[in-house]
Amino acid sequence: MFDLTGKNVCYVADCGGIALETCKVLMTKNIAKLAMLYSVENPQAIAQLQAIKPSTQIFFWTYDVTMAREDMKQYFDEVMVQMDYIDVLINGATLCDEQNIDDTINTNLTGMMNTCATVLPYMDKQQLGKGGLIVNVTSVVGLDPSPVFCAYSASKFGVIGFTRSLADPLYYTQNGVAVMAVCCGPTKMFVDRQLTAFLSYGQPFVDRLRTAPCQSTTICAKNIVKAIECAVNGRIWIADKGELELVKLHWYWHMADQLVNYMHSTSEEKDED
C-alpha cells in the first residue's frame, strides 16, 4: 500500500476534468504539497482545492507539455525550490485531435516522455531525490485499437510501451522510481467534446459516442488515486465503468525473456559465455 500522507505530488496536465477531480481526491489524502503544472490557469479550481485541505500547500505554473526539454528544466528548477523534492509525478496531459497528428503525439507521448526525462534526476535516489512514483494517466485505447481515433490510440499505445520500458528493474533497482500507468475508459467530459474521426468513414461512430454510456470524471479520478495507493512498479490499471482492474501483461516476442535475462546478467556471467 502506497501511503500518500505527507507526500509531495506534482501533477502535469491540461485543463481537463479528470486532472482537477483527481487533485480533489488527492487533497483528501493529507498530502503535504501539490504542484500543478497546467496548460490553463484556473484560480477558481485552486481555491476549491485549497478549501478541501487548507494545510496542504498548493503551487501553480502555466505549463506547455510540448515545450523543449531545456525549457522544462527551468520550470522544474522552480518547482524544486517550492517542493524540495517530488514523491509522486502524475502525467495527465491529453489531446484527441485526429486532424492534427503532430500536436496529438507531442501532447500525449513526446511531452510526457520529455517531462519524465526532465523530472527523473530530481527523483532518482542516486542523484537529487529519494525515489518515488511516476503515474502516467492514459487511455484504454492504448491497450486495444480505436478505428476512429487512430492517432490518439497510437499515442496512447506509446505511453504504455514507455511506461513498461521505464519500469524495468534495470532502472528501478538503481533509481528507486517506480513507474505505472492508469488507462481510463471514456468519460462524459471526453465524449461531449467536438471530436473528429481520423477518416471520414468513422465519423458516424464518433457522433454516436455522445449517447454512449460512460463514467463520470469523479468516479474515474477516485480510481486513479486508488491505483496510486496500490502502486507496484510496472503495473498497468484500467479505470472504467466505475471499476479498477489490473491489466494482465504478456510478452509476445518469443525472444523477450531470453533478452531480458541477458540484459540483467552480470558482466562475469557474460565473460564466461
From Swiss-Prot:
NAD(+) binds at residues 11-34. The keyword tRNA-binding does not apply. Substrate binds at S139. Signal peptide: none annotated. It comes from the Eukaryota. The keyword Transmembrane helix does not apply. GO terms for cellular component: cytoplasm. Keywords: Oxidoreductase. The active site is at Y152 (proton acceptor). SUPFAM superfamilies: NAD(P)-binding Rossmann-fold domains (SSF51735). Transmembrane segments: none annotated. One of its GO terms (molecular function) is oxidoreductase activity. Belongs to the short-chain dehydrogenases/reductases (SDR) family. This is Alcohol dehydrogenase-related 31 kDa protein. The gene is Adhr.
